């Protein structure tokens, strides 16, 4: 069973990771965020498996609760930023697919007469 001091240190470390991840999301550093997310999840798993001792006083419990609330608030903000990024990427993918479709269509008609009397590209060289 973890000592109250060790438990507080672990919760503060989780909060620090949470703040770092939020900072990375705000600054659009997605690759680094993904790397840190692994460490964050491991930290959360470690805390989930660490029981809170019964002898922790109410002040310490309140402090731990406040830390957890801030971590959850940070997670909500990161989730919003991730959703915004996913929407941006989805839009970019849609634009890319439209551009590919347009390019494919133009390539299909390359070398063809589009209007009556138009010369083919090979006919203009004579």
Swiss-Prot record:
GO terms for biological process: bacterial-type flagellum organization; negative regulation of bacterial-type flagellum assembly; protein folding. The keyword Oxidoreductase does not apply. Keywords: Bacterial flagellum biogenesis, Chaperone, Cytoplasm, Repressor, Transcription, Transcription regulation. Signal peptide: none annotated. One of its GO terms (cellular component) is cytosol. It comes from the Bacteria. NCBIfam families: PRK10548.1. Homodimer. Interacts with FliD and FlhC. Belongs to the FliT family. This is Flagellar protein FliT. It comes from Pectobacterium carotovorum subsp. carotovorum (strain PC1). The gene is fliT.
